């Protein structure tokens, strides 16, 4: 079975939107892919690529690890060319490279995915004459040659050039199909449909549908999508809260529903997945190996941005009935571990990852994020100055069985804040394998030793200094946590980049660091 690998590993602020593709395109374990610079970084790092230093023409770097033992690195450059480099995952030695030029002028790369050694790229182009956004796709061999020609695959009429196209792409788990559609920042009207076009790997269109959802008292704004192996599509309402630059966050409201559309029988089915007396804060959904849909996330008892527990809903395959629907509150002991005595809920936690294991177990990973303000007054002028701090703190993990019960819950202490909301070195990277789970992040060097003392439960604060370490936290399948220092960031004056998360074969963990227009990949011993 061919498996597509999609990745958005960026040196700076993300331009593309690949994160939603990861959960639908992988059937294997996630791995951390990061950037680094020297073979002398740490005894835990051994093999490194040759890398790039101070290349001013380098815009972004994206990478992917494949089943056939290759690490694919794609460099986007200012001249519009893409450099495709291939390395052996075992030794990280270069085994090939090619240069890909855009097939036409004014194309904007929106998405790409890799199946075996064929790279499929999806572009958008603003058509000023026709007042529309045109979408094209092209396939390239590993030698950089264009397969066939540039294909026109979608379009959307516009009232003026949009700030961004809103083009989205979802792959089936077996990577034999992908669907294109537009999901813009502006909420849809009741009468507005969603225009889907589904293709196979050869860019042959399988079906097309302008899907209009059933009328409802409240308009269901759909922002979650899944494509199953048969080519049918699932949709789910609700836009999850994001870690925004604002210091105020409003939880979701309104009707919460999921839909199933079979393009071959034209059947549209609706599922009500809301909680009657509770507030759904954030959810994700994914397909398991049986093609069942797993919906899981956080809920609140008080209709504020405070998490009270987890919810789990399982839909039978191919638009079947609801197999399981339940919610589970956090235990008092876990809330005390996270927040201390006297608390009943967890504040400011955002759902980042939903992992569905082969055993049917579901793992939810969320991070505590909030914006704080500090106001100071200049004693001479009386002028007030406001400092905003963007805080990335503890991470929590919950493992749920198929009955929605918590098998284990883990707190991973972490404290970070930055004054720059566009700094890519904050937060964390998550990976899953058959052996368990791993979280990697930049950390103060005193944290590991400090947390080894059972009397101290707070990590030391890291604020962006390169006099720091990269911490690796491992969680076993039974919920046992261990914390080690992966490498000392001081040696090369570089920082771990958490945006660089990808999928690949179990057993190949590749790490690294980035700084401006420089990068390098390394893997552990």
PLM region descriptions:
Residues 230-234, 248-367:
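Long, internal scaffold/assembly segments composed of regular secondary structure
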Residues 1-48:
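Bacterial Sec-dependent N-terminal signal peptides
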Residues 272-282, 327-345, 408-428, 466-469, ...:
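Conserved blade-ending motifs and adjacent loop-strand segments that build the rim/top face
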Residues 59-67, 111-116, 164-176, 223-230, ...:
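Structural signature of eukaryotic scaffold interfaces centered on beta-propeller domains
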Residues 63, 67-77, 117-129, 175-188, ...:
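Short beta-strand elements that form the blades of beta-propeller/WD-repeat-like
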Residues 54-55, 93-130, 150-162, 212-222, ...:
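Blade-loop segments of beta-propeller domains
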Residues 86-88, 134-143, 193-204, 249-266, ...:
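Beta-propeller blade signature
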Residues 352-356, 361-372, 376-378, 393, ...:
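Loop/turn-rich, solvent-exposed surfaces of beta-rich toroidal or solenoidal domains
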């Amino acid at each position: 079975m061919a498996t597509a690998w999609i990745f958005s590993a960026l040196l700076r602020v993300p331009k593309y939107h690949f994160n939603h593709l990861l959960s639908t395109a992988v059937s294997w374990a996630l791995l951390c892919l990061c950037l680094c610079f020297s073979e002398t970084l740490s005894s835990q790092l051994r093999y490194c690529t040759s890398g790039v230093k101070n290349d001013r023409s380098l815009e972004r770097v994206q990478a992917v690890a494949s089943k056939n033992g290759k690490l694919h690195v794609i460099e986007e450059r200012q001249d519009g060319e893409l450099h495709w480099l291939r390395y052996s995952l075992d030794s990280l030695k270069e085994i090939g490279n090619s240069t890909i030029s855009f097939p036409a002028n004014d194309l904007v790369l929106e998405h790409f995915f890799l199946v075996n050694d064929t790279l499929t790229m999806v572009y958008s182009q603003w058509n000023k004459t026709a007042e529309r956004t045109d979408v094209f796709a092209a396939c390239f061999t590993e030698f950089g040659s264009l397969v066939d020609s540039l294909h026109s695959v979608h379009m959307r009429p516009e009232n003026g050039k949009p700030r961004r196209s809103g083009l989205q792409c979802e792959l089936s788990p077996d990577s034999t199909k992908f669907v294109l559609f537009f999901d813009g920042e502006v909420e849809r009207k009741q009468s507005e449909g969603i225009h889907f076009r589904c293709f196979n790997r050869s860019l042959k269109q399988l079906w097309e549908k302008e899907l209009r959802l059933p009328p409802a008292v409240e308009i269901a704004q759909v922002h979650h999508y899944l494509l199953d192996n048969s080519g049918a599509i699932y949709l789910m309402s609700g836009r999850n809260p994001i870690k925004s630059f604002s210091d105020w966050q409003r939880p979701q409201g309104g009707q919460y529903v999921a839909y199933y559309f079979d393009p071959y029988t034209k059947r549209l089915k609706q599922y009500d997945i809301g909680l009657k007396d509770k507030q759904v804060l954030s959810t994700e959904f994914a397909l398991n190996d049986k093609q069942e849909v797993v919906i899981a996330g956080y809920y609140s008892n008080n209709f504020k941005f405070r998490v009270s527990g987890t919810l789990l809903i399982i839909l039978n395959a191919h638009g079947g009935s609801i197999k399981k629907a339940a919610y589970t509150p956090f235990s008092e002991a876990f809330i005390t571990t996270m927040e201390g005595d006297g608390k009943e809920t967890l504040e400011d936690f955002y759902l980042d990852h939903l992992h569905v294991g082969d055993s049917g177990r579901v793992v939810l990973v969320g991070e505590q994020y909030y914006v704080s303000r500090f106001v100071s007054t200049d004693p001479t002028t009386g002028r007030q100055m406001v400092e905003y701090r963007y805080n990335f703190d503890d991470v929590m993990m919950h493992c749920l069985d198929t009955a929605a019960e918590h098998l284990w819950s883990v707190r991973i202490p972490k404290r970070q804040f930055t004054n720059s909301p566009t700094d890519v070195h904050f937060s964390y990277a998550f990976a899953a394998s058959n052996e368990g789970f791993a979280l990697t992040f930049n950390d103060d060097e005193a944290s590991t030793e400090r947390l080894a003392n059972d009397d101290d439960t707070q990590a030391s604060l890291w604020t962006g200094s390169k006099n720091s370490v990269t911490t690796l936290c491992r969680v076993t399948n039974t919920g046992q946590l261990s914390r080690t220092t992966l490498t000392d960031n001081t040696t090369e004056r570089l920082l771990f980049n958490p945006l660089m998360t990808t999928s690949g074969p179990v057993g190949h963990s590749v790490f690294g660091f980035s700084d401006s227009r420089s990068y390098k990949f390394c893997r552990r011993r």
